[in-house]
Amino acid sequence: MKCIALFLVLSMVVLMAEPGEAFIHHIIGGLFHVGKSIHDLIRGKNRDMAEQQELERAFDRERAFA
């Protein structure tokens, strides 16, 4: 009997929650972020960015010695 009452109370809490307060929105947003990160890793976007930064550092070092 306690389990049934607990189930009904929790069901009402979930149904009465505002859509903006939903935890599912955060989960879905996190999944999209993870998917984009994996996609960027596969395509090598971060690798190109790191390579560009390394070239800029080398250029700055050469300019400092000149």
From Swiss-Prot:
PTM info = This peptide exists in N-terminally amidated and non-amidated forms. The amidated form is more active and has a greater alpha-helix content than the non-amidated form.
Query: Which positions carry the signal peptide feature in this UniProt record?
Result: 1-22
Checking Pfam families in the record gives: Antimicrobial12 (PF08107)
Pro-region residues?
44-66
Residues that the record marks as modified (Arginine amide) are: 43
Q: Where in the cell is it found?
A: Secreted
Q: List the disulfide bonds.
A: none
Q: Name one GO cellular component term.
A: extracellular region
Q: Which UniProt keywords apply?
A: Amidation, Antibiotic, Antimicrobial, Fungicide, Immunity, Innate immunity, Secreted, Signal
Keyword Protease in the entry? The reply is: no
Q: In which tissues is it expressed?
A: Expressed in gill, skin, intestine, spleen, anterior kidney, and blood cells.
The processes (GO biological process) annotated in the record are: defense response to bacterium; defense response to fungus; innate immune response; killing of cells of another organism
Question: Where primarily located?
Answer: secreted
Family, similarity comment: Belongs to the pleurocidin family.
What this protein is reported to do is described as:
The amidated peptide is bactericidal on human pathogens like S.aureus or E.coli, as well as on the fish pathogen A.salmonicida. May also be active against a variety of fungi. It can kill bacteria in less than 30 minutes (S.aureus) and 120 minutes (V.vulnificus). It induces hemolysis of erythrocytes from human and fishes (sea bass and lesser-spotted dogfish). The non-amidated peptide only inhibits growth of human pathogens like S.aureus or E.coli, and the fish pathogen A.salmonicida. Induces hemolysis of erythrocytes from human and fishes (sea bass and lesser-spotted dogfish).
This protein is called what? Pteroicidin-alpha
Origin organism of this chain?
Pterois volitans
Q: From which lineage does this chain's organism come?
A: Eukaryota, Metazoa, Chordata, Craniata, Vertebrata
